[in-house]
Amino acid sequence: MNIPIELEVTVPGSPPKKACSISTWSDPVQAPLINTLRKQIVDVKCANGIQGYCNWGLVEIDIIIRITETSVKADIDNHVGGIFDAIQARPANKPNYNENVFEPTTHPDITVLLSDDMLVYDLHAIRTLAEKESYTVKISGEYNASL
């Protein structure tokens, strides 16, 4: 049975950032940003009784990145890649860095929202100026408990 999942989180600060084809999980500097996003997701899932993660069908993701005039600039696709990496489990071949940054519910080996970003079929990402840095991730997909 497929269970629909819809979730939206808004996170203060800058999103995790991927550099070229290197996984966000390979950069220890990104660990606190990854953990912040993962914690927000886990909190929203718990508050709304959402179990599981998107692992079936087609997934839609909307991302809004709010930057200030003094924000450190990065290509929008680097942030999208960083967010995608962060909502999946860390690949098995990535090192265990900064394990103490993560809580048991946000541990890198846990899939918090997306089993594989190849399920994403529709992506909308925008960057806009704001008074404070933050970003919003909205995801719609399905969880198949039998997988």
Features from the language model and the residues they span:
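Acidic, proline/glycine-enriched N-terminal capping motif
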Residues: M1-L147
